[in-house]
Structure formats: C-alpha cells, structure tokens
Amino acid sequence: METIRILLDTSAYIAFLKGHPGVKQAIQKADEINLNPMVPGELLAGFMKGRREARNREILQEFMESPRVRLRAIDEETSERYAAIFTFLRGKGTPIPTNDLWIAATAMQFGLRVVTTDRHFQQVPQIIAETHA
C-alpha cells in the first residue's frame, strides 16, 4: 500500500479548521502531513491580527505536535527549485505569490502532493496540486 504524503498550504489549514469536507478527508487519509515554514509563518501573522491569537496558536501547536505532521526546512535544493519554478512561471506571465512558490518548491523537492484551496498551484506543472475550492 502506497504511503500518502501531502504538503498542506495555509489556505487548506484554514479550510480544515472550518470543516471543509474535501480538505478534512485529505488530511484524515494522509499518512504524512508536511508543512513548509511559510505556512506557520502566514498563520501566526494572521493570528496576531485577530482576537483569538492565543487560542489559534494553541490549536496550531497541537496540530504540529501530531506524529503525522512534519515541518520541512528550506535548504539549498529548495532554493534551486524555487528559482526554477519562479523563472518558468515568470516566462509564461503567470506568477504566483512568493510564499506559494516556496511551498511549490518544497512539494517538488520531496515529491509531495499540495493540498490547497488556491487554484494557482495548478500553474506549476512540476507538482501535483489537489485543489479544494
């Protein structure tokens, strides 16, 4: 049986908390849930603007402490893949947000399926994006 390894983007984490059935199912089925450092960074920035910062931090910490969740570091190989994706998309005239480029680079590096609610990941042919709108 194949191991299901996903990379969760920020939009999917938020959708999961809101009970989005497709995202919830993708997370429940996954053997390994990966995060790029941009995801907790974006989430923490959002928490700081809200009224429930402490509670949201607690929920995120509990999620990240799961034995199925793995935080992937950005290294030289990730940077090379970022540059390749950036150059490719810029050449096509279809750029995506910078943090999502890092997420795509991480997915490409480790062969992970990106679970997201953002359609722009589908512009990156080097990755598999599972989009839940």
Q: What kind of region is each of these model predictions?
A:
Residues 1-4, 104, 108-133:
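Acidic, PIN/NYN-like endoribonuclease modules and their adjacent C-terminal/linker elements
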Residues 1-39, 45-62:
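Short, well-structured N-terminal submotif of metal-dependent ribonuclease cores
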Residues 8-9, 36, 95-97, 118:
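Histidine- and aromatic-rich ligand-binding microenvironments
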Residues 50-54, 89-90, 131-133:
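Short, hinge-like loop/turn segments at secondary-structure boundaries
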